[in-house]
Amino acid sequence: WDETFADDGTTIYGNAGGAWTAFKSGGGDDELSAATLVDIRANIVHATSTSAHYADLAERYATDTSVEAGDVVMLGGSEEVTKCNDDLSDAVFGVVSDSPAFLMNATAGNNESHPMIALKGRVFVKVKGTGQAGDRIVSGGNGEARIATLDECTTFNTLGRLIKHKYNEETALTECVIGVK
């Protein structure tokens, strides 16, 4: 709430119960500036977004271990998700995201107790090994992914695909698309 806001006579209020309020400062009809913008504050906004700055769909899940962006997780452990420590895990679930385009279950916990788990879309993943754009990734243990051979891939263990070539063997955050087999 902006405590410095003062009613200059051009303020328009809606629903005194507090469901929404619109503020508008004065200015000419053709004047575009910060002073003429409308600031809407609401309890619930029903709107349609036509674009997003980021490219993954994520949801908050309770975790039983410390995780960070790019970590591969699986369902299970003592909470909902845990870091995936198995190679070629059929329980692989998603990747910890730091900037999802859309976040579901947003009010559940915080990033330590309920990290944002990317379920689909473009996200940076901790990948070890070299690979070409389009190569499939699977869990590689220690919360990392690795490049899979075609004979290793199944519907259950494939996490996604590399978007760009990866030229070094070291584990690095690598742009991938997940949820694509």
PLM regions and their residue ranges:
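Small/polar residue-rich beta-strand/coil "junction" motifs that cap repeat-based extracellular fibers
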Residues: 1-56
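Extracellular receptor-binding modules and their adjoining Ser/Thr/Gly/Asp/Asn-rich linkers
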Residues: 29, 37-181
